[in-house]
Amino acid sequence: MDDNKRPLYLPFAGPAILEAPLINKGSAFSEEERIFFNLEGLVPYAIETIEEQASRAYDQFRSFNNDLDKHIYLRNIQDTNETLFYRLVQNNISEMMPIIYTPTVGLACERFSKNYRRNRGLFISYPNKDRIDDILNNSTRQKVKIIVVTDGERILGLGDQGIGGMGIPIGKLSLYTSCGGISPAYTLPITLDVGTDNPQLLEDPMYMGWRHPRIGGEEYAEFIEAFMQAVHVRWPDTLIQFEDFAQKNAMPILERYKDRYCCFNDDIQGTAAVAVGSLLAACKAAGTELNQQRIAFLGAGSAGCGIAEAIVAQMVSEGISDEQARTQVCMVDRWGLLLDNMPNLLPFQQKLAQKCTNIQNWSNFSDNISLLDVVNNAKPTVLIGVSGVPGLFTEEIIRAMHSHCARPIIFPLSNPTSRVEATPKDILHWTSGQALVATGSPFEPVVVDGETYEIAQCNNSFIFPGIGLGVLASGARHVSDAMLMASSRALAECSPLAIDGSGPLLPKLEDIHAVSKHIAFAVGKVAVEQGLTLPMSDEILQQSIEGNFWSPEYRRYKRTSF
């Protein structure tokens, strides 16, 4: 029987039910439920359906004049009635996703302490490092299957937001549910409060976190270790997603734990998976293969290098050598093109640095080889921006790229919109509508010479909910590179432009449930093939995906005792 049709037995009654967001129905409690649970008089007389409630809530949502107020309003619904919240978001996914997540969530993080209203998730502060087990036991969610955790040091492109970074795990888990069908009862946002180096927060009397410079070194590593061990003891089968850790910590944490626990880093691996999926779709639309592309990156941090490594892996899977693939990828950061003779390159950058011998025939470049120098000499067919600095994809650079590439693939992926390397409008006008464009944040369609171009949002929300659903449905013990590659290929298979030759590069958000299920199956199937879970047939895996997919419907309630 469908869980939504099965009654839920509750051992308590009265106002406590109305204060529990996972079970509160508000005005939708039936007459029988109002009597048996002592709710008569606590809600208005009319008994409403969830659609009637959602209609009222949508009218209220539309009455707000700015996105931050809309975000606060939706968060208030989430904190009082989660089923209604997810029905409302599901009904209006394209309109509300930019409100509950990027770009609005960035502003919500900056103003987290000022706008704080009600607790959600767990804050684990360094002074409480010896009581992590107790803190986990205090969680209102007892059967946790997915955790999103941050330390708030690198929130989107906004930098150190301290505990204000909690807005990101809350938002990400909202998308796990609204896009991937993960029951909100199984999700837990966590912020690791290890201090902040943001002077504005340290001096702000309203700041609610630990007022202390960030810890680092061994202290930080030991704190992360204690947290990971405690989570594994409390919820041994939980998927942990690392979110918005600083570059200096993100990759080391991932490398330390990816083979010990079921975990992944969305900024590195999720971003890479959706970028590769989008590139595969763009290549198919352009009638070419990824291993034939020459790719230039602006931004050589952990996210950019993570995407580059995923691209190299996909190129190798298409038949070229690892060495050849790396010659086709150029990484540019603030110091110019990464070269193998540069000092102080980070370990994950060293593998992607170009050999000096590869550029000995280049001409007309400066001491620090700029992106324009790379475009003029390497003649890339793909340009990816993950710099977090607006405006760096200049008209000169885009026109130079278009001069040697009829259909350039250009992905300015930096978030939020204020940090984008170039707007889709500019890119499409500079290329006479020929560029294949995807962005990290949402943009309105662009009209060039009377033709309308829908802008694909190369957003991780197309990937991580499906990965989470696939891990839960299959029971995978780890998230392997092959599972991530499978998610990229599955996303590309859903591209309207690649399938039909028209429409957007990526599916519409209204189709996100079907996309997430398709990705979940691909991810789960690889987990089974790699022996990361118990053997199961394709049919059983598909049934498990459907069985784990939660829908925002009210359940009937029964009393367990009087």
Swiss-Prot record:
For biological process, the GO terms are: malate metabolic process
Gene Ontology CC entries for this record: cytosol
Read off the Pfam families from this record: malic (PF00390), Malic_M (PF03949)
Q: Where does a divalent metal cation bind?
A: 243-244, 267
Name the enzyme group at the top EC level.
Answer: oxidoreductase
EC number(s) recorded for this UniProt protein: 1.1.1.38
Where is NAD(+) annotated to bind?
154, 267, 415
Q: Which cofactor does it need?
A: Mg(2+); Mn(2+)
Which residues carry the site feature described as Important for activity?
267
Active site as annotated: 101, 172
Identify this protein by name: NAD-dependent malic enzyme
Organism, by scientific name, is Shewanella baltica (strain OS195)
